[in-house]
Each structure stands twice: as structure tokens, then as C-alpha cells.
């Protein structure tokens, strides 16, 4: 047995499923997960000492590359002053101010420790602000593992959802309406039937949890118009897309001003840090100013804030996003060309430093489209690349990520490996 196998067996004896987040278990693709020993730049090394070019990027946060020396130094300096205080720090103010400069929709902001906390609290805040209970989410969008958001579509077009996890009471989900992404007619019908009862609409503005799905321009326009008309709060869940698809997030690309925004991943630079923010009148409903309660012992942790501030500084440097976008487009175009040459049904898409790979004729517009893609083909591709030293997320439903550490030459090397894998798949 190799080290990965030994560690997985050992982990399963004490950690449920052997992992601390389900996708890491390789359940969707089969095989043994790689236990990572270290990471630097665009690479990770497993416990066997095998090096992989990494397109997981810690599921998005590693936008400047792993263990960036400036980020590490900022964290080291912060750690010398103490690890956690349970009291306010100047760094919390600075990072909130910097985010507000980048995202004009954020008039007030609060730090938390995870994306789940951010979305859970944003939903609670929207309900408290509006005095309404019902929420709209979209099938295939993931917003963390809080109870009201672990909901899948009901049996009818506009029936309320069913729990997507054991342990979530069915009665608890009666206020959550699950609609099809990019379906304007469903959205209009939902507001026509229940508009005065809807507290908020939450969505991933580019969906990263059914690979990469783009919203249509008409869809985001309808979202903004309908929520404004009916007094519902529009929540952009930018935990994944914030500072990843563009400096100003998806909202800057859409030209949309959401009422609330949730963010995470990149803003922590690889450390546990997230936030929610938006309109002043809504945000001032949160305690201690208002009656909507939220708290956290480690919210605004000084080490995480230091990592986040340095990451935000780096990504604001001239040419950062132009280069990141160009490298990501180079990758997906190379994959498309390689698959076409091998006669494999495949397409790919990207926005900023985020990309999606689909074993289908066309990029998906919603969850049903993604579910019809060739998942078995993805599994073969995933293992073919992994065996040759290229790591993608172990699920056909997860987006991939490029960092500033991925050079054009490294992208070319990855594409060359993909050429081999596509040829082998076609044989």
C-alpha cells in the first residue's frame, strides 16, 4: 500500500468517510484521495511525494498561487502579535474598507469564518429586514450546508422544496422555493403567485457547483427587476465568484447592484474568512444595531485578515486579471482543440480565473443540462490526467481554477497531457 492508501484507511477509522468535506473522498470518481503534504505556486505534492499541477486551488482561494511568499510573510507578522483576541482589530476595519472600495454595492460589511455562515446569515438578515419567510433559490446552486438551503426541487413546477440532506426536517423547507436556473418564466410565475411573501432570492451569479453555468443577461435583469418590484432582497452569493471572475466579482460583469453579497474563499487568501455585506439599511438590522442575531468567536481572525489583505493587494496590481483570464482561456481553448482532434464530445467555458469542463455538445444552462453530460467520460478524463500529474476537482459538477502561478508554459504542458488523455479515451 502507498501512503495515500494507508492514510485513507487510517482516516476512515476515526473521521466519518475519512474526510472532513465529502467531495474529498473521491466518491464521485472512484479511487483513493490524494493526501496533500505541501503546496507551492501552481503545484501540490501528495504524501507519496508525487507532484501535481493543481487546478483545484483549494476550491478557489489560491488565486495568487499556493504559499505565496508575501502572503506567508503577512501571516507570520500577524501571528507574532497573537493568534486570536475575541476583540476588534484595526485589520478588520481595513479589509472591510478595501472590499467596499472594490464592490460599490457593499455599504456595510461583516466578517465571518465560512461561506456557510455568510449565506445563512444573509438569508436570516433578509427575512428580518422584510418580515417575510419565503426564499427562492435555484436548483444546482450551492450556498453552504445550512438547513434552509439544503433543499432540492419539489415534484411540481412551483412546489416548495424537499430536503436534500437527512436531518433537515421537511417542515423546515416549506419556505424554500427551488426554481430552474436561467428560467425567467418560472421566476415570473413565482413572484406572480407569492411575490408579497418572498423575503429574498439567492443565487450563484456564475454557478460553480454544477461545473460552470453562465446566467443569461435577460435572467439577471429579470432577477433585479422582479426583486425590486416586489420588495424582495437580491442576494448574490459570490463566495466562489467574488474576486475570482473579476476584481469586482460577477456583479461588476453583470452591471447589477445586489442588495446583499456574500463572499469568501479569495478574501481569506486560503485562510478561513468570509463576509456578507450590502445596503446600509439592511445591514443595520444586524445585532448589535438591530434584532437579527449573528456572532462568531473567530470572526475577523487577525491571521486570516492579514492573509486576505495581502491577497487583495496582490490581485489589484496592474494586469493581474488580464493575465489570469488569458491563461484560463488558453487552457480551455487547448482542451477544446485536443478533444475535437480526438473526436471526443466535449466543450469548455471560462470566466476570469474560473473554468468548466463538460463532456457534452454544449455548455449547460441549468442543472438538468449538466445532469445529461457524460459523467463516465469525466471520470476517465479525471483519472487519466491525475495519473499523469494534473489534478482537477474529483467531481464532474465542480468548477476548476487557474492561479497567477500558472504560467503560459505550464498551461501548454497541461494541454499536452490532455492531448494524450483524449487520445487514450478515443482508442
UniProtKB/Swiss-Prot annotation:
Biological process annotations from GO: protoporphyrinogen IX biosynthetic process
Keywords assigned: Cytoplasm, Isomerase, Porphyrin biosynthesis, Pyridoxal phosphate
Gene Ontology CC annotation, any one: cytoplasm
Keyword Nuclease found: no
Localization in the cell: Cytoplasm
Pathway assigned to this chain's UniProt record: Porphyrin-containing compound metabolism; protoporphyrin-IX biosynthesis; 5-aminolevulinate from L-glutamyl-tRNA(Glu): step 2/2
GO molecular function, one term: pyridoxal phosphate binding
Names of the cofactor(s): pyridoxal 5'-phosphate
Gene3D superfamilies, sorted: Aspartate Aminotransferase, domain 1, Type I PLP-dependent aspartate aminotransferase-like (Major domain)
EC number, UniProt record: 5.4.3.8
Enzymatic class: isomerase
Residues with N6-(pyridoxal phosphate)lysine modification: 265
HAMAP family recorded: HemL_aminotrans_3
Matching NCBIfam families: hemL, PRK00062.1
Family assignment from sequence similarity: Belongs to the class-III pyridoxal-phosphate-dependent aminotransferase family. HemL subfamily.
Subunit: Homodimer.
Protein name listed in UniProt: Glutamate-1-semialdehyde 2,1-aminomutase
Organism this protein belongs to: Neisseria meningitidis serogroup C / serotype 2a (strain ATCC 700532 / DSM 15464 / FAM18)
Lineage of source species: Bacteria, Pseudomonadati, Pseudomonadota, Betaproteobacteria, Neisseriales
Amino acid at each position: 500500500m502507498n501512503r495515500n492508501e494507508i492514510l485513507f484507511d487510517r482516516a476512515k477509522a476515526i473521521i466519518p468517510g475519512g474526510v472532513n468535506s465529502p467531495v474529498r473522498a473521491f466518491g464521485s470518481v472512484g479511487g483513493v484521495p490524494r493526501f496533500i503534504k505541501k503546496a507551492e505556486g501552481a503545484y501540490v505534492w501528495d504524501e507519496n511525494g508525487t507532484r501535481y499541477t493543481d487546478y483545484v486551488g483549494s476550491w478557489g482561494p489560491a488565486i495568487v498561487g499556493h504559499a505565496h511568499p508575501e502572503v506567508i510573510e503577512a501571516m507570520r507578522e500577524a501571528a507574532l502579535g497573537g493568534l486570536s483576541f475575541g476583540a476588534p482589530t484595526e485589520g478588520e476595519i481595513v479589509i472591510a474598507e478595501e472590499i467596499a472600495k472594490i464592490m460599490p454595492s457593499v455599504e456595510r460589511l461583516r466578517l465571518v469564518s465560512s461561506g456557510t455562515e455568510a449565506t445563512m446569515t444573509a438569508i436570516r438578515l433578509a427575512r428580518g429586514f422584510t418580515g417575510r419567510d419565503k426564499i427562492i433559490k435555484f436548483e444546482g446552486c450551492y450556498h453552504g450546508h445550512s438547513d434552509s438551503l439544503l433543499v432540492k426541487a419539489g415534484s411540481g413546477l412551483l412546489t416548495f422544496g424537499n430536503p436534500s440532506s437527512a436531518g433537515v426536517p421537511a417542515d423546515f423547507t416549506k419556505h424554500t422555493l427551488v426554481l430552474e436556473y436561467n428560467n425567467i418564466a418560472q421566476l415570473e410565475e413565482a413572484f406572480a403567485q407569492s411575490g408579497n411573501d418572498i423575503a429574498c432570492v439567492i443565487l450563484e451569479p456564475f454557478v460553480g457547483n454544477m461545473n460552470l453555468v453562465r446566467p443569461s443577461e435577460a435572467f439577471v435583469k429579470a432577477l433585479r427587476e422582479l426583486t425590486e418590484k416586489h420588495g424582495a432582497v437580491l442576494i448574490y452569493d459570490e463566495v466562489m465568484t467574488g474576486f475570482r471572475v473579476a476584481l469586482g466579482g460577477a456583479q461588476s460583469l453583470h452591471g447589477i447592484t445586489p442588495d446583499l453579497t456574500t463572499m469568501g474563499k479569495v478574501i481569506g487568501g486560503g485562510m478561513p474568512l468570509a463576509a456578507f455585506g450590502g445596503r446600509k439599511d439592511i445591514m443595520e438590522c444586524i445585532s448589535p444595531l438591530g434584532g437579527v442575531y449573528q456572532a462568531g468567536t473567530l470572526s475577523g481572525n487577525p491571521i486570516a485578515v492579514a492573509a486576505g489583505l495581502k491577497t487583495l493587494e496582490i490581485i489589484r496590481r496592474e494586469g493581474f486579471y488580464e493575465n489570469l483570464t488569458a491563461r484560463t482561456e488558453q487552457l480551455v481553448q487547448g482542451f477544446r482543440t485536443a478533444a475535437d482532434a480526438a473526436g471526443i464530445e466535449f466543450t469548455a467555458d471560462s470566466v476570469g480565473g474560473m473554468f468548466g469542463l463538460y463532456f457534452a455538445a454544449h455548455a449547460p444552462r441549468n442543472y438538468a443540462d449538466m445532469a445529461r453530460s457524460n459523467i463516465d467520460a469525466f471520470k476517465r478524463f479525471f483519472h487519466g490526467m491525475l495519473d499523469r500529474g494534473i489534478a482537477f476537482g474529483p467531481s464532474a459538477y465542480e468548477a476548476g481554477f487557474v492561479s497567477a502561478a500558472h504560467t503560459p508554459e505550464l498551461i501548454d504542458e497541461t494541454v499536452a497531457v490532455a492531448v494524450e488523455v483524449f487520445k487514450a479515451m478515443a482508442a
